[in-house]
């Protein structure tokens, strides 16, 4: 049973499968798959869509068939509220109806236009169907690595010429505006016909900016044309040219180029289009008969571009057959058709390049648009008719115009355009009066002179374009200059009129009046390389030549007087500038009445010689360098004096003017000395300010430290003794020992400098520890104050009895009676042969501090780390903490410091290594290094027996000491508890700390501590860094091993909640006795 049950007998798709690539362009427009099998009714025909074959910017083309199975091409499109597009559809239908019967234009079959409501219109056009097109043919040849043959190229092009000739010769000419290979179809005849289609962009309207405006013309061009096929007048809307039939001729040239070389000549570049910048590739080998067609069609000049009739004649001549079209045969054309051979010769000679507009008159129907300023410039005229040579024979029109001349009341200078590749032509209707006399120059008196064709119009394998003006070997800018007197400079003392345009001197050729009009148009797109390539660089390329011949030029009155006097000084335009009547120039004691105006200044300024400064210079003649063009410029005297730094040039004998300059230079030198003194004073002030700033920064640093420490229960320098809790060391013997060793207090400033900024070789410039409350940027603030001294370094240890501490102690940390006392130590011995390399802490610290500071030039190694705790002026040695031992300690290892050890330990015979936790040490004042262990007397016992005998003795001593310390700790805990209760009974608001100097903060903001007594550390001072251990603090009795604290005991006694520690890195430290308050 067939599937076509519903309508036309064709297979119906019963599912909504979506084929990739189907697009929905407009409302109610169906996809490719849905449109298949759809039957549409036009005005006279009913067709069924079979498949989609093409899709354009506005419509989709389908293959449709009627009941007799005849194939048609159906162009269908929808528009919504777009009147322009709807009108374009109706025009296309109308144009194709007019072309019915032409073999090279697609045949019209039927059309349909319907309003679907809501502003939606459906437009359908039914034409004959051609299965192939030229683009497919080109793709096939590319796949076969082949090109089109010359016969195929000429056949396609001649058929297109017949089609375009038909539409151009209609009673109302039709402009296709979209000629391209995609719109050329191939019929199925033998031989095939090439058919033109797609008249959707066609129009009968000749666009003109003057008539329709720029915006309308621009929108029409962009909507209906393809970029790479656009003509130059479609690029430059301000050229004043019409966009009409000749735009199709240009598109035919681009189409022919693509047929030959499978590429477009200008790509998508408006610049290349506007400058007609293209070249012929060497492959494939295209004959000159086809190249000359491209050469003639791609002409920038609309009026010189051939018409469709001339193009058809040339094309059929190249194809060696006569035109078959009646329109071409019966065409009554008044234009002369050149022969193909003459065009080929013209192309080879290059005498009439096609990328330069000719002097042919413009279209009278649409004169070019000109701005008022440009039109006004046309009325300007040359100063003298004698300056223009107009030979009646074959000579060229030349003129010489002085640079930057202002038009005077009786002298008018024409606005001659800058030098460009535009061919020089005559001005047949331009009047050039001079001083009351008027002459007319006729076009017959002037012969056009071609210019070098410097663009990329190289015809591969052919003779290059030859310049016709090779005889003029001097160059366009090498003509002799005209003296100012010849130009009528008789009224230079009069106020000059404003000039219209700056001109540069050189050789000028007067172009045709029409070319002047064209060149003066406002080039909005500024994309014409012909206006850029030569005019921008020719003046500079010929500047050297002009300078060489400038010896014959009299540039100013000053120059003339110098030449007459035989002066060898270099002329300076600023010295003759109109600063004042008394300082212009003087000759024979008389003041000249010459007053140079701006135009004269501009002329002579361009002629400044640029030569090397002589080696022999005289500094006594003048402080102004005559070679410097700005040496005498009317600037401030201070600025003028700066030019005296350059070496002066020897000048002629001094005149009155030179005396004035000498006085000026002396005054400038005095002022310069005053300025130098002021600069020195200012430098001193700046240094003072910098010192004050450094003091302010130091004070700010101290304030930050004070603020940071005060927030952790008075650990800062300015913290009062009331803010510190009770310490865990109240031994009376140790208090007396501390009092005996403390001679006085140091001030806050000295203490802060000595504890933080002390410098002793390695130390001094190290910032505070990482967790003492300062940020990284504060550390950098400290650096600037610490690195001030480089030679004298104060001792690292501060003794209270030394001259360094003359003021009473104000540091609360030094006022603590239990704080260890510090004494100045003697310099350590330099011999460190018995030390291990791993314990060379000087190098370790150097590696760390060098990342921030530069090492002083002269310094000595110090084995002590320069870091101190906030309450400690004693240096600490950096060591890594070893892991806790699993067994009881056996012996002690003497460290690198000058620490006194028990005698039993000194007798130890172990190898030096890192101390083990739990080792009993006695930290005290630095003493001499421990002597090497004495050799033991040989005994009868074996080494194994000696070891076993020594270990029990050592273990027994250690156990006894540990027991004593535990008992003492219990007693101390009881005493501390009693003192704490007494302290609270007195009403003191300061709670006791646990020795860690860390403040407990509760949620309610109150600082409280647990009533439980924590175990105290046996070391009085511990570093905040785990690798730092107290080294040189001597206590009265040996200390037991450190007992680690657990943070679980630290809770708020009021709230019972876990407390957060502001600074948990501090280890237990000594606290003041509250009874001292």
Curated annotation (Swiss-Prot):
One of its GO terms (molecular function) is metal ion binding. Residues 960-969 have a biased composition (Basic residues). The keyword Transmembrane does not apply. It comes from the Eukaryota. This is Serine/threonine-protein kinase sel-5. Residues 369-399, 638-648, 799-810, 941-950, 1054-1067 have a biased composition (Polar residues). Residues 927-936 have a biased composition (Pro residues). One of its GO terms (cellular component) is cytoplasm. Keywords: ATP-binding, Cytoplasm, Kinase, Magnesium, Metal-binding, Nucleotide-binding, Serine/threonine-protein kinase, Transferase. Coiled coil: none annotated. Residues 655-679, 770-780 have a biased composition (Acidic residues). GO terms for biological process: positive regulation of Notch signaling pathway; regulation of clathrin-dependent endocytosis. The gene is sel-5. Residues 47-317 form the Protein kinase domain.
């Amino acid at each position: 049973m067939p599937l076509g049950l519903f309508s036309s007998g064709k297979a119906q798709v019963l599912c909504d499968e979506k084929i990739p690539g189907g697009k929905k362009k407009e409302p109610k427009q169906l996809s490719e798959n849905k449109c298949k099998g759809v039957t549409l009714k036009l005005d006279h025909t009913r067709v069924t869509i079979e498949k989609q074959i093409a899709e354009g910017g506005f419509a989709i083309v389908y293959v449709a068939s009627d009941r007799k199975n005849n194939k048609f091409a159906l162009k269908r499109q929808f528009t919504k509220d777009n009147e322009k597009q709807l009108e374009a559809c109706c025009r296309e239908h109308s144009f194709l109806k007019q072309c019915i019967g032409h073999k090279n234009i697609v045949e019209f079959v039927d059309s349909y236009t319907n309003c679907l409501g809501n502003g939606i219109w459906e437009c359908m056009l039914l034409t004959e169907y051609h299965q192939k097109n030229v683009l497919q043919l080109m793709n096939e040849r590319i796949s076969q690595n082949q090109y089109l043959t010359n016969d195929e190229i000429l056949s396609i092009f001649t058929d297109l010429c017949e089609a375009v000739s038909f539409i151009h010769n209609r009673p109302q000419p039709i402009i296709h505006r979209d000629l391209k290979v995609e719109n050329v179809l191939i019929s199925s005849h033998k031989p095939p016909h090439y058919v033109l289609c797609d008249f959707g962009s066609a129009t009968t309207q000749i666009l003109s900016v003057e008539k329709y405006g720029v915006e309308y013309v621009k929108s029409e061009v962009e909507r209906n044309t393809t970029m790479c096929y656009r003509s130059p007048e479609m690029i430059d809307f301000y050229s004043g040219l019409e966009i009409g039939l000749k735009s199709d001729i240009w598109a035919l040239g681009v189409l022919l180029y693509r047929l030959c070389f499978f590429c477009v000549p200008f790509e998508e570049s408006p610049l290349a289009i506007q400058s007609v910048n293209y070249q012929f590739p060497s492959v494939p080998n295209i004959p000159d008969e086809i190249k000359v067609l491209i050469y003639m069609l791609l002409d920038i000049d609309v009026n010189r571009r051939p018409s469709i009739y001339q193009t058809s004649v040339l094309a059929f001549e190249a194809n060696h057959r006569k035109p078959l079209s009646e329109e071409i045969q019966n065409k009554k054309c008044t234009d002369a058709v050149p022969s193909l051979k003459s065009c080929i010769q013209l192309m080879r000679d290059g005498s009439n390049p096609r990328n330069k507009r000719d002097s042919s008159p413009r279209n009278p129907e649409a004169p070019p648009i000109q701005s008022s300023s440009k039109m006004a410039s046309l009325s300007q005229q040359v100063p003298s008719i004698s300056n223009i040579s107009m030979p009646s024979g074959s000579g060229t029109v030349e003129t010489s115009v002085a640079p930057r001349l202002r038009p005077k009341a009786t002298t008018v200078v024409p606005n001659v355009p800058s030098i460009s590749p535009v061919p020089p032509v005559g001005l047949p209707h331009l009047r050039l009066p001079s001083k009351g006399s008027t002459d007319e120059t006729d076009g017959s008196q002037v012969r056009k002179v071609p210019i070098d064709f410097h663009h990329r119009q190289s015809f591969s394998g052919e003779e290059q374009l030859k310049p016709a003006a090779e005889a003029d070997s001097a160059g366009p800018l090498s003509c002799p200059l005209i003296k100012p007197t010849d130009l009528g400079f008789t009224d230079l003392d009069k106020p000059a009129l404003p000039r219209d345009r700056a001109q540069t001197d050189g050789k000028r050729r007067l172009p045709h009046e029409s070319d002047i009009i064209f060149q003066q148009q406002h080039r909005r797109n500024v994309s014409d390389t012909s206006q850029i390539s030569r005019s921008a660089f020719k003046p500079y390329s010929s500047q050297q030549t002009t300078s060489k011949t400038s010896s014959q030029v009299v540039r100013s009155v000053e120059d003339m007087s110098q030449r007459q006097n035989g002066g060898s000084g270099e002329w300076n335009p600023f010295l003759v500038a109109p600063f004042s009547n008394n300082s212009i120039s003087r000759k024979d004691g008389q003041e000249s009445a010459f007053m140079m105006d701006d135009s004269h200044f501009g002329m002579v300024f361009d002629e400044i010689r640029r030569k090397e400064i002589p080696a022999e210079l005289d500094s006594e003649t003048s402080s102004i360098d005559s070679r410097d063009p700005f040496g005498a410029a009317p600037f401030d005297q201070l600025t003028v004096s700066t030019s005296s730094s350059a070496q002066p040039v020897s000048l002629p004998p001094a005149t009155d003017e030179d005396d004035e300059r000498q006085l000026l230079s002396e005054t400038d030198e005095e002022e310069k000395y005053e300025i130098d003194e002021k600069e020195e004073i200012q430098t001193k002030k700046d240094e003072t300010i910098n010192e004050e700033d450094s003091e302010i920064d130091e004070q700010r640093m101290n304030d930050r430290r004070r603020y940071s420490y005060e927030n952790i229960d008075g650990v800062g320098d300015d913290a009062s003794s009331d803010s510190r809790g009770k310490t865990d060391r109240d031994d009376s013997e140790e208090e007396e020992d501390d009092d005996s060793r403390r001679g006085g207090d140091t001030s806050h400033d000295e203490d802060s400098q000595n504890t933080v900024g002390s410098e002793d070789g390695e130390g001094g410039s190290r910032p505070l520890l990482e967790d003492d409350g300062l940020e990284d940027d504060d550390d950098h603030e400290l650096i600037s104050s610490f690195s001030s001294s480089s030679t004298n370094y104060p001792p690292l240890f501060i003794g209270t009895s030394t001259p360094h501490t003359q003021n009473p102690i104000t540091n609360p940390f030094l006022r603590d009676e239990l704080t260890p006392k510090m004494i100045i130590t003697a310099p350590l011995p330099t011999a460190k042969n018995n030390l291990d390399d791993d314990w060379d802490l000087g190098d370790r610290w150097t590696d760390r501090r060098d990342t921030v500071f530069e090492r002083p030039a002269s310094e000595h190694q110090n084995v002590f780390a320069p870091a101190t705790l906030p309450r400690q002026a004693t240096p600490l040695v950096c060591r890594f903490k070893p892991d806790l031992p699993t067994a009881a300690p056996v012996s002690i290892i003497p460290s690198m410091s000058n620490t006194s050890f028990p005698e039993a330990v000194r007798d130890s015979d172990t190898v030096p290594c890192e101390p083990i936790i739990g080792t009993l040490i006695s930290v005290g004042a630095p003493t001499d290094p421990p002597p090497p262990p004495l050799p033991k007397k040989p005994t009868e016992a074996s080494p194994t027996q000696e070891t076993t005998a020594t270990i029990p003795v050592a273990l027994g001593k250690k156990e006894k000491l540990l027991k004593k310390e535990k008992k003492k700790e219990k007693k101390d805990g009881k005493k501390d508890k009693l003192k704490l209760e007494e302290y609270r009974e007195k009403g003191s608001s300061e709670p006791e700390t646990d020795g860690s100097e860390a403040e407990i903060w509760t949620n309610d903001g109150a600082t409280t501590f647990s009533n439980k007594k924590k175990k105290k550390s046996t070391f009085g001072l511990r570093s905040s860094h785990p690798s730092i251990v107290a080294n040189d603090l001597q206590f009265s009795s040996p200390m037991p091993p450190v007992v680690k604290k657990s943070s679980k005991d630290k809770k708020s006694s009021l709230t019972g909640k876990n407390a957060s520690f502001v600074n948990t890195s501090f280890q237990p430290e000594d606290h003041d006795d509250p009874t001292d308050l």
